[in-house]
């Protein structure tokens, strides 16, 4: 969505600013550091807002599934939500200098990919001929290094 794209762009900007920072000194370096701090604060605010919206969407989709457990679209949408959340976390990981912190974020991202996988798998169980669902599953399997499953999904996706 729009919020996650904006956050991703801000991480890119932070990466570039921090690279420039190595060649700066004095007031220019301070201004650069202030800009990075401001971007990080903005990302934090937007991330909290995005998390609130995501949580609400997940709750609503789970209600749909309770009422209509064969709704493949609801499972697919949950898969998309978790896959997007993973992508945002991978962006955050890539913009994190502290290796221990980056490893924790990487673990969170992979947990979200596994949630996406479970929902995409359920969607394909309900609607096995939907190539779009298989393409999404292929992407997740590939990201998780599940190459045999990725290959099978690729065939079912008609790729």
Range-by-range predicted roles:
Residues 2-56, 84-119:
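Short coil/linker segments at helix-helix boundaries
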């Amino acid at each position: 969505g729009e919020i996650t794209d904006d956050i991703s762009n801000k991480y890119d900007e932070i990466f570039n600013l921090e690279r420039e920072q190595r060649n700066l000194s004095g007031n220019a370096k301070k201004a650069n550091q202030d800009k990075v701090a401001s971007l990080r604060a903005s990302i934090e605010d937007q991330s909290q807002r995005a998390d609130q919206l995501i949580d609400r969407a997940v709750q609503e989709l789970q209600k749909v599934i309770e009422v209509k457990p064969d709704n493949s679209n609801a499972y697919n949408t949950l898969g998309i939500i978790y896959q997007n959340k993973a992508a945002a976390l991978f962006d955050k990981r890539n913009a994190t200098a502290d290796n221990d912190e980056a490893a924790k974020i990487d673990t969170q991202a992979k947990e979200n990919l596994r949630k996406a996988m479970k929902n995409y798998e359920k969607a394909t169980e309900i609607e096995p001929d939907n190539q779009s669902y298989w393409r999404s599953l292929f992407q997740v399997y590939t990201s998780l290094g599940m190459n045999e499953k990725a290959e099978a999904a690729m065939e079912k996706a008609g790729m």
